[in-house]
Amino acid sequence: MADTARAANPDIIIFVDNCYGEFTQTQEPCQVGADIAVGSLIKNPGGGIAPTGGYIAGRKDLVELCAYRLNAPGLGKDLGCTLETPRDMYLGFYYAPGVVCEAIKTAIYAQCMLELLGKNPVPRYCDDHNDIVTCFDAGTADALIGFCQGIQAASPVDSYAAPEPSPEPGYTDEVVMASGSFT
């Protein structure tokens, strides 16, 4: 894909938001043609432990541009906020490969169940998994809300909560989600 984009525009900068994609393949985006990749430490690379943080990786000039844009003038990537959480971030990196592997196995199991229910998940259990996300059409908004509420009710954390759709910055439609996790 990167080669096709560069053939159309040699000056293109290929940017990848790799959230949920880390540790799912043997190569990361910058190894296959991306100029810059970003992600969140509270997702895959944080192993579900890191309470905050993100990363920027790629071409040195682009990383520096981002660092100067996202930090205080003159500080660049040499100084930044850690909120007293480096231990959690390092621990998250240590746990991340195992946690991501478990998440992919769980996604494959869920995809099998969804197929048995006729819900046509994407990706399918037999497809290559480039991230830990599974999509499916619940049919109606009420069915999706019920699905999320069922997941939440069976979760070890906040099982008393009843997810409801609400506006979310960056989305045109209301968002509903369930998470029985600690982070």
Where are these regions (language model features)?
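Conserved PLP-enzyme active-site core in the AAT-like
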Residues: M1-C101, K105, L114, G118-V122
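Conserved C-terminal alpha-helix-loop-beta "cap" of PLP-dependent enzymes
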Residues: L116-C126, N130-T183
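General structural feature for long, well-ordered alpha-helical segments within catalytic domains
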Residues: M1, Q25, L62, C66, ...
